[in-house]
């Protein structure tokens, strides 16, 4: 993966696919509107302001350009200057390094911001579903201003884009790590050995990672935020071996879901990890994340994929026939610890959300289980 040229003190190194232009004016009407009422994702005092400034190249704006959002300054991110606020970007301090990955709604790059490693996500103008792209951008900002060891933090965000840019907005995030839990589970490291011959995650490591994720969920739920796309690919592992929940493009705030029983909002996500009530189009609750965690814990334990077959058949069977991944393997049946782990997983993916544990209860059970291992 090629790196860009080094950055100067006053410029942004951009990937090759960005075309340089001599002068681009951002029209006053070019600020991306929220597809939903502003109070759903941002307090009204943090709503986008209009400020038509020029920029010399895509993703670069003058150093003293006006803030895109108005409001008080949240606590600063560790390692970054005290004056920084999440609702504005100091573009002169951004230096892109290389692309980390891309998906349906945009691309993620490794970069530095004020000399600190960060990840930068650009949300594209998805021609097939522009509204979905907009929702993804605003949903990512549900966690703006929040800080927790097991959540990837939003450092800064901007809706500012040049006229010819394909980006709806830019989000600068804490760099959570180069490795995802998915890569660790399935050993996606280009090892020549077949998966069946490779070392499995130890039970202790599974519990450590599980507690990291549940701690993150407990914090999110305490802030009335649902992730709604929890899976190993959306869990980063830092250099300090700490799991951090990332990718909040499907997240929702609980207050936005209340009172909408007749017309639940569209919820994205991954069908293999979606709770039955979500597949049925019902209103989401924190228990939907607990279900997704149960599937994730099963993956950590077995290193297998949850289902095979056509997605529509799997979704129907999950709802109609209570289909779940198999718990018949030796890892669950050969020991008392395996049986205890089986019970935890089974409780997480109960058909009815009310029967699943809360994140708080799950945290307590996992800690107690870890204590029995000595």
From Swiss-Prot:
The keyword Electron transport does not apply. It comes from the Viruses. It holds the Pfam family Pkinase. Its EC number is 2.7.11.1. Keywords: ATP-binding, Kinase, Nucleotide-binding, Oncogene, Serine/threonine-protein kinase, Transferase. ATP binds at residues 100-108, 121. The active site is at residue 229. One of its GO terms (molecular function) is ATP binding. It is an enzyme of class 2 (transferase). SMART domains: S_TKc. InterPro entries: Kinase-like_dom_sf, Prot_kinase_dom, Protein_kinase_ATP_BS, Ser/Thr_kinase_AS, Ser/Thr_Kinases-Pseudokinases. Residues 94-370 form the Protein kinase domain. The keyword Metal-binding does not apply. SUPFAM superfamilies: Protein kinase-like (PK-like). It catalyses: L-seryl-[protein] + ATP = O-phospho-L-seryl-[protein] + ADP + H(+); L-threonyl-[protein] + ATP = O-phospho-L-threonyl-[protein] + ADP + H(+). PANTHER family: SERINE/THREONINE-PROTEIN KINASE TNNI3K-RELATED (PTHR44329), V-MOS MOLONEY MURINE SARCOMA VIRAL ONCO HOMOLOG (PTHR44329:SF285). Belongs to the protein kinase superfamily. Ser/Thr protein kinase family. This is Serine/threonine-protein kinase-transforming protein mos. It comes from Moloney murine sarcoma virus (MoMSV). The gene is V-MOS.
């Amino acid at each position: 993966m090629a790196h860009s040229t080094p950055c100067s003190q006053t410029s942004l190194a951009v990937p090759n696919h960005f075309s340089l232009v001599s002068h681009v004016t951002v029209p006053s009407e070019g600020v991306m509107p929220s597809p939903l009422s502003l109070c759903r994702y941002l307090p009204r005092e943090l709503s986008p302001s209009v400020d038509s400034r020029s920029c010399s190249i895509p993703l670069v704006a003058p150093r003293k350009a006006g803030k895109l959002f108005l409001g008080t300054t949240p606590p600063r991110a560790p390692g970054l200057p005290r004056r920084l606020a999440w609702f504005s970007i100091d573009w002169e301090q951004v230096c892109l390094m290389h692309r980390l990955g891309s998906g349906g709604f945009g691309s993620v790059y490794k970069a530095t911001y004020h000399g600190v490693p960060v990840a930068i996500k650009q949300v594209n103008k998805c021609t097939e579903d522009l509204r979905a792209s907009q929702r993804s951008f605003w949903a990512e900002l549900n966690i703006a201003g929040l800080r927790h060891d097991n959540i990837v933090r939003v450092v800064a965000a901007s809706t500012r884009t040049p006229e010819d840019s394909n980006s709806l907005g830019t989000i600068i995030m804490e760099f959570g790590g180069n490795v995802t839990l998915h890569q660790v589970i399935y050993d996606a490291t280009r090892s020549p050995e077949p998966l069946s011959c490779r070392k499995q995650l130890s039970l202790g490591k599974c519990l450590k990672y599980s507690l990291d994720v549940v701690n993150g969920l407990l914090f999110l739920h305490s802030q009335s935020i649902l992730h709604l796309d929890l899976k190993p690919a959306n869990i980063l592992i830092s250099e300090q071996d700490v799991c951090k929940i990332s990718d909040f493009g499907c997240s929702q705030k609980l207050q936005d879901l209340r009172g909408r029983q007749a017309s639940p909002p569209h919820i994205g996500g991954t069908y293999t990890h979606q709770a039955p009530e979500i597949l049925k189009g019902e209103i989401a609750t924190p228990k939907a994340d607990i279900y997704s965690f149960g599937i994730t814990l099963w993956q950590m334990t077995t290193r297998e994929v949850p289902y095979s077959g056509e997605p529509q058949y799997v979704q129907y069977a999950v709802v109609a026939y209570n289909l779940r991944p198999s718990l018949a393997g030796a890892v669950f049946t050969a020991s008392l610890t395996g049986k205890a782990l089986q019970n935890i997983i089974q409780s997480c993916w109960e058909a009815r959300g009310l029967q699943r544990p809360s994140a708080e209860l799950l945290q307590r059970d996992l800690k107690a289980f870890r204590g029995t291992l000595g």
